[in-house]
């Protein structure tokens, strides 16, 4: 949400512009992506726990919300009052913002590629706070360079820390004119607050205690490697 708002409401854009000329650039209409949120279509890829949380927040802004998740059962979208589409191309083709909320695996690595990005509605803003390798960084570079999408906000990258030699990162770091204000990067920090760190430690302890007590293993993502899951 923060990346979306920063781009759509011109927060970082106006801050940088006003630093250059606080008087002459005091012009709200300069923001390149300004659009009333309630007039936007917000798309989510992945309707799990985090995707659902994003949906509820987008709806609170009055946005029309659409989802794509081939693994969710029929009617999952109805339980949160949103619409469903049957392909990524369909989602990207009708949304103003697309936010990614899916795990990384063999079927999702480089899922967001040039074929998908080229189907984007004009002016689309892409947000990735899931996992970096889900988006093909070379294809993202091409999509931004060729104006297939308007802007992108990422909290994750295929290589972390960022590879300063990648063409996209190099152009962003150099403030090249074609990408200026169109790419926001944060250091995998979307989750981070003192409260989040406390929750991770507390919940990790809870899971360990429950497992050691013989009451099962919660949230296991590699059960095939657990010799005694109890």
Task: Walk through the language-model features, giving the residues of each.
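Oxidoreductase and adenylate-handling cofactor-binding alpha/beta cores
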Residues: 1-16, 56-63, 202-215
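Rossmann-like adenosine-cofactor binding region
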Residues: 70-171
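Residues at the starts of beta-strands that form the adenosine-phosphate
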Residues: 41, 63-64
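Glycine-rich Rossmann-fold phosphate-binding loop(s) that bind the pyrophosphate
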Residues: 47-48
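N-terminal Rossmann-fold NAD(P) dinucleotide-binding loop
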Residues: 51-52
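Rossmann-like dinucleotide-binding domain for NAD(H)/NADP(H)
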Residues: 123, 130-230
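Phosphate-binding beta-alpha-beta segment of Rossmann-like dinucleotide-binding domains, i.e.
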Residues: 1-41
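Short, flexible hinge/linker loops that cap or flank conserved catalytic cores
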Residues: 34-38, 59, 118-119, 177
């Amino acid at each position: 949400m923060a990346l979306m708002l920063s781009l759509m409401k011109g927060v970082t854009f106006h801050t940088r512009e006003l630093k250059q000329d606080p008087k002459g650039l005091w012009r709200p209409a300069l923001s390149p992506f300004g659009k009333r949120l309630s007039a936007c279509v917000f798309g989510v890829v992945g309707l799990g726990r985090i995707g659902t949380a994003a949906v509820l927040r987008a709806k609170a802004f009055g946005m029309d919300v659409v989802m794509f998740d081939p693994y969710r059962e029929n009617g999952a979208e109805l339980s949160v009052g949103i619409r469903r589409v049957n392909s990524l191309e369909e989602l990207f083709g009708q949304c103003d913002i697309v936010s990614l909320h899916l795990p990384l695996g063999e079927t999702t690595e480089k899922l967001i590629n040039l074929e998908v990005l080229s189907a984007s509605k004009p002016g689309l803003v892409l947000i990735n706070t899931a996992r970096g390798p889900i988006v093909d960084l070379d294809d993202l570079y091409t999509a931004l360079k060729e104006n297939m999408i308007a802007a992108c906000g990422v909290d994750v990258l295929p290589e972390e820390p960022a590879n300063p030699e990648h063409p996209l990162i190099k152009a962003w770091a150099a403030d090249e004119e074609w990408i200026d204000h169109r790419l926001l990067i944060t250091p995998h920090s979307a989750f981070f607050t003192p409260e989040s760190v406390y929750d991770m430690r507390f919940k990790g302890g809870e899971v360990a205690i429950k497992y050691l007590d013989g009451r099962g293993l919660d949230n296991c993502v590699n059960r095939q490697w657990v010799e005694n899951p109890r």
